[in-house]
Amino acid sequence: MMSISNKRSIFSWMVLALASTVMLASCASANKAVSVDSFSKEDLWSFNGEKKIYGVLYRPDGIKKAPLLIVSHGIGSDHRSGAPYAEALVKLGYAVYCYDFCGGGRASRSDGKTSEMSIFSEEADLAAVIDMFKNVEGIKKGKVTLLGISQGGMVSALYAGDNPKKVEKLVLVYPALCIKDDWVTKYPKITDMPEVVNSFGMQLGRAYVESLYDLDVYGRISNYKGEVQIIHGDQDHLVPISYSEKAHEAYKNSSFKVMPGAGHGFRGKVQQEAIEIIKDFLMR
């Protein structure tokens, strides 16, 4: 028969365990960073109209309602480019979703042709993904944090500017805010552009360019007044750092970190440094 002292010990242990669980859930629900030792991965599909969107959800173990962070990849890439960020940030207690834009890359598992893709079709993909999470169990309802890489940074910035009340925080990693200037300079009129051009190892159509002419990039993205973290290499020859400098000036509440010697595309030590910057930003 169990002694009274043993019963009290077990009861005390149960109370402590319950308190720890409540504290962990409370921290996650408040969008505060917590330390998570393990996580799971699962395939998760959504729809933009009739087009299927593929992605991978990283879930932190032990958190009942995890705040959502969505990673958007660059042109020609796919969800795998977000994996290093997801594997680090899920350990802060975030549910992290990396997905493939429709027509966004050669290895995309989502529907759609690259010749039909534009930054605005990708913004619609992002909106569809965010809407899908309203019905996913284990995800904290409300605002979402966005992390965009290169063209995914442009798309994330546009979405945040168009939907400022839906975004908790915004992280832009060498965001391709040069897209309008690059393409409109090359094709001053849409009729100057062939029906299809080869770029980034894929075929892009007029849909990619025709909606850029009237776009006020900085006027639109600066509608977002929340916290922004911008990270850019000073040796980026694909997207000059001046575009991020201008974004830093346009945003009301941004932090800007220059990565000395880094080009377009972070790897190894530089990528790890960028991840630490992002972690610090999310934890504050």
Where are the model-predicted features located?
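Short beta-strand/loop motif that positions the catalytic acidic residue
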Residues: Y224, I230-H232, D236
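The serine-hydrolase catalytic nucleophile loop
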Residues: I75-E87
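Conserved alpha/beta-hydrolase
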Residues: A88-R109
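N-terminal cap/lid segment of alpha/beta-hydrolase-fold proteins
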Residues: N31-G62
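Alpha/beta-hydrolase fold nucleophile elbow
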Residues: G138-I149
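Hydrolase active-site cap/lid region
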Residues: L158, D162-G205
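Catalytic histidine-centered segment of alpha/beta-hydrolase-like enzymes
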Residues: A262-E273
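Alpha/beta-hydrolase active-site loop
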Residues: S81, E116-V136
